[in-house]
Each structure stands twice: as C-alpha cells, then as structure tokens.
A protein has these predicted regions:
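Glycine-rich phosphate/adenosyl-contacting loop at the front of the ribokinase-like
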Residues: 1-76, 115
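Active-site metal-binding loops of divalent metal-dependent hydrolases
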Residues: 12, 136, 165, 261
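Conserved beta-alpha-beta core of the PfkB/ribokinase-like small-molecule kinase fold
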Residues: 139-214, 221, 231-232
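Conserved phosphate-binding/catalytic region of the ribokinase-like
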Residues: 1-5, 152, 208-321
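Glycine-rich phosphate/pyrophosphate-binding beta-alpha loops
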Residues: 89, 135-139, 294, 300-303
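Conserved N-terminal subdomain of the carbohydrate kinase-like
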Residues: 50-133, 314-321
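Short, electropositive alpha-helical surface patch
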Residues: 62-75, 180-188, 212-216, 248
C-alpha cells in the first residue's frame, strides 16, 4: 500500500492581495500563502487524502512561514527545500470588480524555479497513487529538469499523472515556449484540467468542444476537465460529455484558488472511483461537487489556509438542489 494518495510538485509562494486602504490612503496588501500545487493538496487534505509536496522556498521569513502553513495543513514537507541565496517567490494579485485577477510576479529568479533534479526525492513520488504538476515549474530550465525527473518517476511507478497548465503569461520568455512546454505536459498526463481561456489560446479555437476534440485526438488523454468560471464546467471522457452549472455566490471576493479547489475535488473523485467506466451521471456528480467547492473559495481571501470542509460543500449542494 502506498504511503501517499497525492504528491504534487511546483510553486509555493506568497499571494499578496489587496485588503483596503490605510489611514493615509495607501493600498494595504495581505500576505496569503499560495501556489497552485499546494492549494490542490490543501483541499485534498480536507477531503481526507494523504498528500506530500515537492518544491523550494527561500530560507527567509516568508519561506519559513510557508513551510509552517503547509505542514499545519497536514501536507508532508519532507521534500520541501530551502534556498539560502534566493528569496521566496512573490505574486501581487490585482482583483477587478468582477472577481477576475491580474498578476505581477517577483520571480527573477525566485526560489521555486531553482528546485533541481538532484533535489527531487523519487521515493516520495513513487510512493503516491497520483502525481500532480502544473506549468509554472516548466518556465525555467532548472525546475523544468526537476519536473521531468518527477514525472518520469511517477510514470515508472504506475501513478496516475495529472496536469493543470495554469498559464501565467508574464512568467514565460515567449508564448511559443509556453505552448511547447504545455504540449509536453499534456503528453504525460492521464487527467487534464484546463480553463476556458487556456483551451482557446492553446488550440486557437473559440468553440470549446472543437478545442477539446483537438486535444483528445492529439494527446489521447482519458479525462479532460474544462473550467469555465461563471459558466460552470465540463468533463470529457472519450465520447462522454458532462456539464454542470456553477454555484454563483453573491458575496464573491476574488477567484484566487477556485480552479485549484475544483481540480482537487476532481482528483479526489478519480482516486475514489478510478478512471474506468465513467458515465455521464458519475461525471456530473464529480463536477457538481467540484463547482460547489470552488464557489465557496471565491467568498474567502486566499486559498491554501481557507479550503472548505466536505460538510460545507455538501450543505451548499443540498441548499441549491
């Protein structure tokens, strides 16, 4: 029996989000622990799964704070490294009135992209049922090599491999490079989570179904999840397509972490039910739970520390049905 349900590799950083004005009229920023892979793991922990994180932070105040937050969430940090020369990565998040966001990164370099292949403990990855990664660790040669090593170890050990492109344009030298690296990620995965704007960018097709068909024909990915924000979500499993409406919240603050929460719920369903013989009813059940959980996180600042409990998600579903 494997030690972990899910191991994820990638960025662990501080999301600085706006939190009103000071008495002098200056913008105040709140330091929220973040990073997509750890957000995913935090939600999986809430759902009762055993998880571990592979990554790097700076050997500084913020890095040590992040390590503590991750450990407090129940996530194993045996393969979390500290860099003495480079600081923890920072992201400044500007939130618009509709809840959408714009990012400014302090990451040239940041500690997360200096995780080397030699620092990746293959034994932790091979001791997982599922391995999850995104594209932010593919933006730089050093962490790219670490990611490639981790994916190879996961595939060798028979792990389910899952990928979320999580495109952040400012972090890439060129969008052509981003396309090439995300192409590589899609060739590795059994489950892909992709957003509406990402599928349009990657395939050049405005119609989502046409874009998904291109991905299915090119990469033969068993299960593809499409998140569409306020339009809900879809799941594509071969010829089977399911769709679920969103749970619109009147008190939405921001959308940071919503996609990660959605992704975690999908991975939890896959761990519990496998990737065989999924039908429309099963996929719809999966999407409804994931949509509900994602909607709850939009009512809270940050993500990693405030993931919803299973009971909160089930209560929301019961109230809306």
């Amino acid at each position: 029996m494997k030690r972990f349900d899910v191991v994820a590799l990638g960025e662990l950083l501080i999301d600085f989000t706006q939190n009103g004005l000071s008495g002098q009229g200056n913008m105040m920023m709140e330091a929220n622990p973040g990073g997509a892979p750890c957000n995913v793991l935090a939600m999986l922990q809430k759902l009762g799964k055993k998880t571990a994180f592979v990554g790097k932070v700076g050997d500084d105040f913020l890095g040590k704070m992040l390590a503590g937050v991750v450990a407090d969430a129940g996530i194993n940090t045996d393969n979390l490294k500290f860099d003495r020369d480079v600081h923890t990565t920072l992201a400044f998040v500007h939130t618009y009135e509709d809840g959408d966001r714009d990012f400014s990164f302090y990451r040239n370099p940041g500690a997360d992209i200096l995780l080397s292949a030699d620092e990746v403990d293959e034994s932790i990855i091979k001791d997982a049922r599922l391995f999850h990664f995104g594209s932010l660790s593919l933006t730089y040669e050093v962490s790219r090599a670490a990611t490639q090593k981790a994916v190879a170890a996961a595939k060798e050990a028979g792990c389910i491999v899952t990928f979320d492109p999580n495109l952040r344009e400012p972090l890439w030298k060129t969008l052509d490079e981003a396309h090439d690296q995300i192409d590589w990620g899609m060739r590795q995965c059994d489950v892909l989570k992709i957003s509406d704007n990402e599928i349009q960018w990657f395939t050049g097709r405005e119609d989502f179904d046409e874009g998904i068909k291109i991905l299915q024909d090119t990469y033969n990915i068993p299960l593809i999840l499409l998140s569409m924000g306020r339009d809900g979500s879809r799941a594509y499993y071969g010829d089977v397509v399911a769709e679920a409406k969103p749970f619109i919240q009147e008190n939405t603050i921001e959308t940071t972490g919503a996609g990660d929460t959605f992704c975690a719920c999908v991975l939890n369903y896959v761990l519990d039910n496998g990737l065989e013989d999924l039908d429309t009813d099963k996929l719809t059940e999966m999407l409804v739970f994931a949509n509900a959980a994602a909607s709850i996180i939009t009512t809270r600042k940050g993500a990693l520390k405030v993931m919803p409990e299973r009971s909160e998600v089930e209560k929301l579903i019961a109230e809306r049905q």
